Amino acid sequence: MSAHPRAAAGNGTALTGRALATVFGALMLGMFLAALDQTIVSTALPTIVGDLGGLNHLSWVVTSYLLASTASTPLYGKLGDMHGRKPVFLAAILIFLVGSMLSGLSQSMGELIAFRALQGIGAGGLMVGAQAIIADVVPPRERGRYMGIIGSVFAVASVAGPLLGGFLVEAISWRWVFYVNMPIGVLAVLVVVFRLHLHTPAQRHAI
């Protein structure tokens, strides 16, 4: 393990050793949340319909999230170039967490669909932001390996999502399908705030 936690690379500052492991872990958590919420609601949908009604709009609980995350991804990439990847990534986490909390508090199917879209807007930033930050903090020769690990998050989330969703519905409430994001997201925020130090662009370009 290198005695020096930092070395110049790319547009940011490459990390090594414990510093890299800590930051990478936080980025993995962010990606995991974004991927998890694509599938975690699937086993909760029958219970949600039984509580909120709105059977005809059921598919939009998933679709609104996916559409919002896909549509917002290019915008986050540009905002990261303009204002720095760290503040934009933090904003994405906060949007995602607000959307998660509001989704759990929903009192109608319409509210849930709208708040899932808000969640998706945050998720788009988590996905693109994590990959962009990795490109900044991981030395170039190791970048492919770390990107591969990030990619495996989606495989894990696709299996864990329905299982965790089913467990939470049975053990507590369908609302905890969304509340479960809060402690994980807060941990990721704290690590990024205090351990990730990136160069913020001095020159800002128009969108």
Question: Residue spans of the language-model regions?
Answer:
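Short, intrinsically disordered, charge-balanced linker/junction segments flanking boundaries
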Residues: 203-207
